[in-house]
A protein has these predicted regions:
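Alpha/beta-hydrolase fold active-site loops
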Residues: 55-58, 138
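Structural microenvironment flanking redox-active thiols in thiol-disulfide oxidoreductases
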Residues: 72-110, 121-130
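Oxidative protein folding and maturation machinery
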Residues: 1-46
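Residue-level structural signal for beta-strand termini and adjacent loop
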Residues: 50-51, 155
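Hydrophobic beta-strand anchors of alpha/beta hydrolase catalytic cores
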Residues: 59-60, 91
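Generic structural signal for well-ordered beta-strand positions
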Residues: 46-47, 150
Length: 176
């Protein structure tokens, strides 16, 4: 049985690890994205590089069929997509599902209109999680047209909405 002192040490270690992960996530901003391979619903391989640079902003939406919060936040993401797509915003869904059948089943029911892909192999899943410091989902990475990571979104899609408003407001002011 753990003493109160040992429990406290465990809490401190956990808090330390969480802070370390958050700092690593924050340090991704400004870096060039790292490419990785995914598969589409037909089993064809795709790469992130197939999508980067095609729009002003590309949002990588990391999710999974078993993730309740991911599914609960999807209507808000659909709304943001509808609002900002014509301005140059695109979404690429990246499923972390290990079970392709579960992914495809949920994909058929989703009401989004963006491309959804799935991690190709189990070893790719681990690599992607490490590369992008993913320790929970929903999780998002906003990539600009040049391929630089503009921001990491871990606090829900309200944070994404604030980023989009700021980005497009700034762009509108530049064109005046």
């Amino acid at each position: 049985m753990l003493s109160e002192r040992d429990k406290s040490r465990g809490d401190i270690r956990l808090e330390y690890e969480n802070r370390k992960k958050r700092l690593k996530q924050q340090s991704l901003a400004g870096r060039q994205y790292v490419d990785f391979t995914l598969v589409d619903s037909l089993g064809c391989e795709r790469k992130i590089s197939d999508y980067v640079g095609k729009s002003d902003l590309l949002f990588l939406d990391f999710w999974a069929s078993w993730c309740g919060p991911c599914r609960a936040q999807e209507p808000q993401l659909v709304r943001l997509y509808q609002e900002y797509r014509s301005k140059g915003f695109e979404i690429l869904g990246v499923s972390l599902d290990a079970n392709r059948t579960s992914w495809l089943s949920v994909l058929r029911k989703k009401e989004n209109h963006w491309t959804d892909l799935c991690i190709a192999k189990k070893e790719d899943d681990k690599r992607v999680r490490e590369l992008y410091s993913i320790n929970g989902i929903p999780y998002g990475i906003l990539i600009d047209k040049s391929g630089k990571i503009a921001n990491v979104v871990t606090a829900g899609w309200v944070h994404l909405e604030m980023l989009l408003k700021g980005y497009y407001k700034g762009r509108n002011e530049e064109t005046k």
